[in-house]
Each structure stands twice: as C-alpha cells, then as structure tokens.
Amino acid sequence: MSGDWSIDLTDFTSLQGILDRLLRETQTTPDLGDPMVAYRYLNARRQAMKDAYKQRPLLRIWDKHHRYIADLAGEKSVVVEEVMADSGTATVVIKHSNWLSKFLLYDRRAEEDIQFTLDPNPTNRSWQNRWGGKIVNVNAVRDKDGLHTVELEMVHNREHAKHILGGANPLLPPEIQFPKMFFLPWNMRTAGSIIMFLNLARQFFPLLSIPTNIFNPGAWLGVRDVIGGLNPLAWPIQVQFVNPLFDQSRTTILSSRWQDLHTVLAAPMQDAGCMLRAYTWLTEDDTSPHPELGALGDALARPTRNCVVFAFEDKSGVTGPTGTLIDGPLRLIAETADDLITNVIVPPGMYDEDGDGKTDPLIRKWLGFAPAKPKVVFREGEYTGIIDAKRSMKGSTAKTVMTGSRSPAWLNQLQTFGIKYGLSQLSAVISYVLGAYQQPGTPGLEELYQGQLDNTLFAWQRFTDPRRVLLMGDLGFLEHFEQGQGTAYTSAGILDLRNGHWKTRAFVSFKTSIRNGMPWIADEHFTLGDRVAFQLGSVLHVDQVSAIRRSYDADSPLLVELSLGQDLDEEDPVAKAMRTLAGFWNLAGTFFGSDSMF
C-alpha cells in the first residue's frame, strides 16, 4: 500500500495547537496521504454544513411593494411549511412589547400587504431555499395567564397561482372572447410558463393590460410604470424562463376558461410529474432566478426589483433519449401505453421487481423513459434519519362492481320506435275491422307511449373479478355500486366499472417523516419535490418530498421535518390515460367547431 499512513502529533501539545490545526485543515485541501487529516477535513466539512442549517433563521418583513422594513427578532415561536402541490403556511408569535407589534396592528391600513421572508441559512442566503409569503392575519392574543402576544399568520407566495385567472383568450378583453376556451398542446413546463406569462401580461404589460381592461379602468392602476412594465424582468410576479427546445417534460394539453391557474395546472402537472414552485427573489441574491436565460449573461437575466418568480420544474426523474423537446410526445405515448395496457393486462403484483407493491413501468422501460433511481436514500439503522414510517396494506372491499341506472340512448330510441310502430299498426287494424270510417280514439294511439319502459333493458351493468372471488374467500365483501355517468353498456359505463374496480382494489401505501441532516440535508442535497428513497423493512420505497417544515420556539431548537408522499389515494392509471385522450379529443373539437368550444 502506497502513502505515508503515520499520524503527525506535533501540534497536539496544547489546546491552541489543536484548534489552529483544525482551522487550517478545514480551510485548505487536505493531504490525501494522511488518513487522519482527510477524515478530519471531511468530518469538519460535513459538520459545518449541518451546523449552518441549525442557525437561527433570518426573519424579515417587507412592505406592499416588497421594500425592506425590518428584521423580525425576539420571536417566541416560528413554524413555516412549504408544500409541493399547494400553498404552504407559516405562523410566527412575538411578544406584544416587540417594537414591531404596534406597526403591524395599528400603524397600517388593513388592505396594505406586508410580505414576510425566512432564510434558513442566514450566512448563505439564496432565492432557492428562501421561504417567502404574505401576512394574511395579525392576531393580538391574551392568554389565561395574562401574557400578551401577537400572532402572525402567513401564506406562501404560491397562493398567487390561485388568484391568477387563465383567460379563454388572454389577448382580448373579457367582453370579447373568441374562441371560448384557451387550448395549448405542448410540453408541460413550456405550456405552463406560456399560459402564466400571458395571463400575467394581462396585468402588468401596458400594451396588453390597458386594451384588455378597456371597460375596467380601475385595472390601469396596475401599470402605473408604463415604461418599466414593458420589461418582464420588472414585473412584481414573474415566470421563470423555459427553453422550449430542451424541455423534456411530458407533452400535455392545457385548457382554461377563466379558472384559476392552480386548478388549471393541478391535474396536468400531476400527470407529467412536474411541480409549480414560487421563489422569492431579492436584489441581494448573487444569481439570477432565470438560469435557462443565463446564455444572455447573468446581468441581463436578473430582475430589476424584488419579486416572486414562478418556476415549472420537472420532478419526474425521467430523462429521454434525445434530450430535446421530442422526448415530450414520446414520453406521453410510452406512459399512456403503460396506463392503458400494462396496468390493465398485468395483474397487480405480477410485475413488481422492486417489491414496493406497484406495477413497474414496462413500456416506458423499453422506450427509455423509466424514472431513474434516486441518489438520496434514507436507510434504517441505529443512526437512521427516519423519524416514523407507515406502510398500510388495504384489502379489497368488493368482489363485484355495479353501475348504471339508464339504458343506452340508442336502445331507448329503438324500443320507443318499436312500441310506437306496433301501436300505430294496431290503430290501423282497429280502423279496418270496425269500418272504413274514423273510430273515436284510434288515431294517435301510438302517442299513448311516452317512454314508460325507458331504462328497463340493459340499464344496469355488473362485473365480478374472478381473481378477487378466489382470493377474498367466502366472507369477502360482495358488492360495490359506482355512481359515475349512470349509463350502462356504453364506453362511459365501462369506465365507471373500471373506476369502481380501482377504488375497491387492494393496495399498499406509504407515508414517512425524515429528520434533516442524517445524513442528507434539505436544500443542500435535495429539495422540495425531489424523488428520494426510504427503507422500510427490506424494501426501498421511492416517493417525492411533498413538504418541508421548519419549527422552533423559546424552549426547542430548530427542527426540520420532511414529509414523503401524500395522504391521497393513488389515481387510477386508466383514468389518467382517458383524461389525456379526452384532452386531445377536445382539442380536435376546437378545430371542427364543437359547440362546447365555440
């Protein structure tokens, strides 16, 4: 073995010598030939990273135009949470004697916004890990012991997405809307940034904001700075630039008709494995919040003011074979084929190589679109970072699924035609037998039938899963009724049976909480929405970081908690595939003049 493995103890004669040596070793590249020096360097570096996130966070408040007011100090307790698919919340409690209490309670109008930011690492502040939000409620509280406090309730800046409407045609005023619905087929990140940019332009871009609010002059106050509004980097709310040529996210169809963008984007982003994150950027930050615009130079890509930047991020873990926008439609085909074929033909648990209880992607693996294995893995052991984990195995709740209440329309029409035709022939026979003159009551005899027998034939549909019958045994739950569309023996009825079959299936779900820094550090090795793995028993389960929560108070140190997965039942893959196909069908309808679109 090469290298000198002896240990140098010359500086260990005094405590000061030890400290000087440790400081010198953490600031310079270690001598890899000395294992103790290399170990101390790596250990000190790891500990420094952990300690950096144990500092008291930097809390600041800002005015309605996001201009600095003051640092918030002397807090009694702080709880902030950022959520992947919704608006996170925060609560800060300060003493009533705090000098900011009077300002927050009395020295401002209730309509005036106050912004709040929290930097988890005050010595290395960055827009990428900053929590930014709006104070929505200020409570003056007196408890039973006579202690007066002020409680600040905040909501994360992602809440803005719930208050931006997606216009049917954002380039025209609401009084003139043609076509009746906005449709955009594109890769998810690009499509999301386009629809949000257009609807922000309605608010901040003077050449668009004034014409689209021609009958609403009050909105003109939002573009007081006409010259500055021409620059999207000067808007208070911005969209992170996405290079459409290298956007590999899954192709989707976005449609809106004056719904809020949170609702418009929720299902397409879930299907594409993307998330919408709201960053709070300050002019003090070293880097631009538009990294894909960096080819122009960081100076040209920097916003000109403090702002909120919405970013569409692909967290699916999938990278396509071409590395370009072509991967989007190819991935759509592969995933839809897996949803429609693999999850229907392959019985649950038959193709599950990793043992996590979910059918592995088969067609996606063939075409090169299977998600990559996560780099961050939390394992069980004596020093594990897993706080608690729960594996739930839910049994099947029905052998038979039933749906319906109405017969197919064509069957009711055929039945009506047959009965009315028979009655009309009966009327002719009566007239012939009783004489060649009109008999009272015979004309219009067929009009006696007014659909009394509609929805009596093939109005109900059932499906019994033979595999469940054998596995559940004699005492298994028997039946489940799925409401659905209510028409049996149609494509809608078949989908209703499938939905009911999915809801009553046996499945395995997981939920876990992770302690930060053991060994992975949030916002250093991974961030919100990233796919990480955690060990439960002998199986590694993969899920996304759905929430990051930071809390501390006067008696407890800073605690960072991570939530993996969501408390939502996994969606039926066939329903996802049908929603995708329906989107393309509706898009075709717009070109052929469908009444629902034009």
Tell where the protein language model's regions lie, with residue ranges.
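A generic structural signal for ordered alpha-helices
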Residues: 70, 182, 239, 246-247, ...
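Generic detector of short, locally flexible boundary/turn motifs and exposed helical patches
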Residues: 22-25, 52-59, 114-118, 241-243, ...
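Broad, structure-driven detector of short, well-ordered beta-strand segments within folded domains
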Residues: 274-281, 401
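Short, conserved helix/loop micro-motifs enriched in His/Cys and acidic residues
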Residues: 231-252
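Beta-rich nucleic-acid/ligand-interaction surfaces
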Residues: 283-298
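Assembly/oligomerization scaffold segments
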Residues: 2-225, 252-258, 262-272, 278, ...
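Glycine-rich, flexible loop motifs
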Residues: 221, 226-235
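An acidic/polar, Gly/Ser/Thr-rich interaction patch typically located in mid-to-C-terminal regions
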Residues: 74-108, 254, 263, 321-598
